[in-house]
Amino acid sequence: QPITESQRLFSIAVSRVQNLHLLAQRLFSDFESSLQTQEQRQLNKIFLQDFCNSDYIISPIDKHETQRSSVLKLLSISYRLVESWEFPSRSLSGAQRNQISEKLSDLKMGIQLLIRANQDGAEMFADSSALQLAPYGNYYQSLGGDESLRRNYELLACFKKDMHKVETYLMVAKCRLSPEANCTL
């Protein structure tokens, strides 16, 4: 049977987020491998006590809640997660920033198209006015030594985590629209 426009858009969006997630994993891995073992242990301890800016975005807490969420809800959460990275991604180094910014913008546009295609008169962001993300810590200030190291670590770890979430949500949403799919996580 022919592929629908919605399925095609989902395939493109999933491919884009997979690419971003792999990039996030590589950047995080490269950063970790540049650290001394002691530095890495310290950063891991600190990060476990901290949280990501995007934790303010209400999203499913486990795979069961993800499975029960509507396609539109998963798309809206994905959109917010991607949007929440537009500003923080600018604080990365030049090459990383260029790689990520364009990909985020493309992914955001793709998710917007998917939301429009899947809306049944539902409001896209019923509670978006309540979503006011605080600036991403001190990422935009020039930081010295250990603080800068910690911020880079947190930024890359959170970016990796959020791209994994978006990838999961888009894959579940895509699966739901596929007639013969078994959508288990």
Curated annotation (Swiss-Prot):
Q: Which PROSITE patterns match?
A: SOMATOTROPIN_1, SOMATOTROPIN_2
Keyword check for tRNA processing: no
Q: List the disulfide bonds.
A: C52-C158, C175-C183
Citing just one GO molecular function, the answer is:
growth hormone activity
Query: Which parts of the chain are coiled coil?
Result: none
Q: Which UniProt keywords apply?
A: Disulfide bond, Hormone, Metal-binding, Secreted, Zinc
Instruction: Output the superkingdom of the source species.
Output: Eukaryota
Residue intervals passing through the bilayer:
none
Subcellular localization(s) per the UniProt record: Secreted
A GO cellular-component term linked to this record = extracellular space
- According to its UniProt entry, what is the function of this protein? Growth hormone plays an important role in growth control and is involved in the regulation of several anabolic processes. Implicated as an osmoregulatory substance important for seawater adaptation.
Q: What is the protein name given in its UniProt record?
A: Somatotropin
**Which gene codes for it?**
gh
